[in-house]
Amino acid sequence: MALLQIAEPGQSAAPHEHRLAVGIDLGTTNSLVAAVRSGEALTLADSEGRHSLPSVVHYGVDSTLVGHDAEALSALFPAQTLVSVKRFMGKSLSDIQAGMQEFPYEFSVSEQGLPLFVMPQGAVNPIQASADILRPLIERAEKTLGGQLQGVVITVPAYFDDAQRQGTKDAAELLGVKVLRLLNEPTAAAIAYGLDSKQEGVIAVYDLGGGTFDISVLRLSGGVFEVLATGGNSALGGDDFDHLLQQHLQAAWGLTSASAQLSRQLLIEARRVKEALTDNDTVTAHVSLDGSDLSLEISKADFEALIATLVKKTISSCRRTLRDAGISTDEVIETVMVGGSTRVPLVRQQVEQFFNKTPLTSIDPDRVVAIGAAIQADILVGNKPDSDLLLLDVIPLSLGIETMGGLVEKVIPRNTTIPVARAQEFTTFKDGQTAMAFHVVQGERELVDDCRSLARFTLTDIPALAAGAAHIRVTFQVDADGLLSVTAMEKSTGVNTSIQVKPSFGLSDLEIATMLKDSMKHAKDDISLRMLTEQKVEAMRVIESLQAALNNDGDLLELSERESLQAALANLGEIAKGNDRDAIEQAIKALDDKTQDFASLRMDNSIKAALKGQSIDNI
């Protein structure tokens, strides 16, 4: 597997080979597939030049139709034609029971309690239906790119839970396709605009699709996108604009009742008029009915009056979501527009007015999510130019933590495949220590000063025990996106704290290569220095431990014995200031030999204290 081959930074194991990977926007209404070709991310068209594929599946007795062909049959065979399958992903039958009457389908239930659609070919679950939508997109990509895909990145709404995400992944794996990553749709849109590597701050992603509206508030910091809040309306989208215009035409022409065929004809014309009004002040609607031609001039003002209430609802959702995130509009540095319905001028005007800044619209809003997914897929599969964002499926440099003496304890070694989790236990250095500071570093050198600092945090409320008695478990976890979470937990109380950081942020291939070369160049000196430092730390521990023992139980010794130990302590302290490792080691051993009798006296004294007042029968 190419991603797991170890090569020097900036070099693939087979530099001449371009690996094929795509990004897929698996949408509620439409789906798209995109790829990076000649350095540019583009959506891929079908044989008829169409980029979007309607997310519709028709199940006939002997055949399954997907996309445009299925959509054409949706009015005639609604019970056999699945639309908006994404709404059912990861849901149990009980989850959708309240709204089942809204759907024309016959439902049954699986052994796991999941909804099944009863079709002429048999029962179909949402995962299988999603796989049927993905299939023509995968086939289109492999035909266009001329080879088998090595992986895909599929986008999902930011609010999808684990079950919905797993269902999406399972749909691709039913087709034998490797899912490199599931990517949040708003994050994909931000990546398409290059916001992941250029800025830090709060980004709002306004996504008005055909059937749903989503608003996501993201914080970008250190190359990491954090979803602060999401909101929206799952029953509001561009289709509602079409229906309002359809009803307006129907009323204007006096069509009090309309057949399914006429309703569809009116809806298609309403959609055409809506799209034409984006660039025109007036458009004439035309419909042929029983040999008669009906026409009506629609102005942009007419259309905006029809949809104004719906647009205001989306702005209200934006206001609520910002409030949930604890963010003001002044803190939003960019607004990204996603979804074909954001082309409507009134929508753009209202969004600009609310956020008080011009939204990003230069990338086709229908395609921006797929394009961002394609950029991510190209990086993950290994086609990364030196100038691109560093995102590897192995850890390029070791991750570790600072220990006493400024030494580095490596927790996750370089070239470990991700995702990964590793843990180590540490303990307190001094008696009564109730807090511990952690310094997370990255690099191959033995000393902290020679490594890259990533983060610092402190664990407090550690029980006040003797040095070495408290046990703190430190867990390093790197997820599939390269995001490092470090958690420190005191085992007896469960008190814990954590921090997140992206080790790859701001780190170029050249810097990685330099750090690796330095580690090899200085390896011998670093090891010697580490061994010396470890002896100095041990000397410090012995000195502090013995000094505390003398303070507590020094009266157990004769004066001459106490003076002898104090002299040995001073001697070790003086030798530890130097750089002779062997001399420090010998001084520690000499002091250890001198304290044997004192240790026995302390042990006897502790036993006597414990047994004082106890009868033989109780022992």
Swiss-Prot record:
PROSITE patterns: HSP70_1, HSP70_2. The keyword Lipid biosynthesis does not apply. Keywords: ATP-binding, Chaperone, Nucleotide-binding. One of its GO terms (biological process) is iron-sulfur cluster assembly. It comes from the Bacteria. InterPro entries: ATPase_NBD, Heat_shock_70_CS, HSP70_C_sf, HSP70_peptide-bd_sf, Hsp_70_fam, ISC_FeS_clus_asmbl_HscA. One of its GO terms (molecular function) is ATP binding. It holds the Pfam family HSP70. The keyword Nucleotide-binding applies. Belongs to the heat shock protein 70 family. This is Chaperone protein HscA homolog.
